């Protein structure tokens, strides 16, 4: 049990050293198809601007090399580490300096510094054009003409836009993408069959990318202790019947898998993830009764299914926690003997009893418990000091409960679009220095929490909502870190992972902010507004709303609502006009003048 939070222990350490050639070992374990897919993802995540053909060429060279090593492990260079092999390969790209600038300096470094340097240059917001979906017939033709290239292009386009996408999971998405085309390109109505499937994959993919980004941020910014604590809480909720030792083993293995993927070690990560799935399926009886249906599936589907599996039923006769963690006279002795194990067990016991709490709340409770023990175990009468520790949890529990209740009520009342607008106003007032596109993206996603979580039963609302908000706010933190503009954002993002959401919730109107000068150009619109999709229209209107609040941070709800209603009416009027552009040219300045007057 002492191994729970010690990173030295890991089953991977033991099998690693027996292979003369790491690249041959991974090729044999993963098979050619997965090997090639993962190498393509790795290269696309590092060199996000390189053309597709360049990457395919690199992947083919690495694959041919791996095959020579499989044939003879002692062949030249086969004993080199994967980082050395891949890094050397990346550094052969001729246009490295002109395309990536200072990233080319990484090539002068030795491993492991070189790989760290490449990782630091991954761009979370790469300047790439949005993906445009071709006509269905065009896609089906491309799929039939060259299925392999079609699927590689999918891996490449997603990986370069999402440099931290969980690689083995991206292979699963690609398999579903392939299945959708194989089925729908045969269908009578291709579009009706295919488009909903592609929309679903796109939305799920974006969600998967964002969830993984939070895992990588936890590991990179807060260390593996933070990730392990998160994993103990989550797995204890999922597997309440499993023993603590079993949960600890899974946490250790899961931490290794994610550390590897977040570190760009995609072959090791995928191999270890497959081992973990195998282990879980061989030991279902001591983990969870819910794993059965996952374990019959093929590998990629199996791993995905295990990751998403629903919570097992709680054992019926769990005793009260107070006996061991409050009433016992040995609390301080047990804590002092092995602090992290004792806290890990506390977190496990609390989490398995509370599938209705968010993981972040459970971690806050464990943190509060730790702080109380640190204080009380040094006191004259420790037991007297910590006797009321569970009462101190109450406000911590009520805060997210009330937050979810209030925001779900607001969502029910307003609907998604107007709920997003309320959040846009709220967040622009808190952190007006943040760029408008980032505020729009983050607030739109925060607003999606309503449709995602508010219709769930009470017991599932908080874990759904708060853990989703943590994922969305991490996106704000990641974008803000690239171009920091607000000390408040930096403070909320870096001080504490588990308190990020309460930190943002607690921010008030930024009094120090100097309002942005009014710029008529920002509020000038043209006839192209009329041909936009509903979503694009919303983004345009929401962009204007953010700019209004930046110009008048103290505007009231009523004032802003008046201006937005006028805006909608003005756009609708001009889009119905015979000469649309003339209408925008004439009505636009009137709208701007009326808005300024309304906000004066």
Swiss-Prot record:
Molecular functions per Gene Ontology: DNA binding; enterobactin binding; fatty acid binding; metal ion binding; pyridoxal phosphate binding; toxic substance binding
The entry's keywords: Calcium, Cleavage on pair of basic residues, Copper, Disulfide bond, Lipid-binding, Metal-binding, Methylation, Phosphoprotein, Repeat, Secreted, Signal, Zinc
Propeptide residues according to the Swiss-Prot or TrEMBL record: 11-16
Binding, Cu cation: 19
N6-methyllysine modified-residue sites: 550
Signal peptide: 1-10
Paired cysteines (S-S): 69-78, 91-107, 106-117, 140-185, 184-193, 216-262, 261-269, 281-295, 294-305, 332-377, 376-385, 408-454, 453-464, 477-493, 492-503, 530-575, 574-583
Post-translational modification, as annotated: Phosphorylated by FAM20C in the extracellular medium.
Pfam families documented for this protein: Serum_albumin (PF00273)
Binding site for (4Z,15Z)-bilirubin IXalpha: 256
N6-succinyllysine, modified sites: 221, 452, 535, 580
GO CC, alphabetical: cytoplasm; extracellular space; protein-containing complex
Assembly, per entry: Interacts with FCGRT; this interaction regulates ALB homeostasis. Interacts with TASOR. In plasma, occurs in a covalently-linked complex with chromophore-bound alpha-1-microglobulin; this interaction does not prevent fatty acid binding to ALB.
Function comment: Binds water, Ca(2+), Na(+), K(+), fatty acids, hormones, bilirubin and drugs. Its main function is the regulation of the colloidal osmotic pressure of blood. Major zinc transporter in plasma, typically binds about 80% of all plasma zinc. Major calcium and magnesium transporter in plasma, binds approximately 45% of circulating calcium and magnesium in plasma. Potentially has more than two calcium-binding sites and might additionally bind calcium in a non-specific manner.
Identification of the protein by name: Albumin
Species the sequence originates in: Macaca mulatta (Rhesus macaque)
Gene name in the database record: ALB
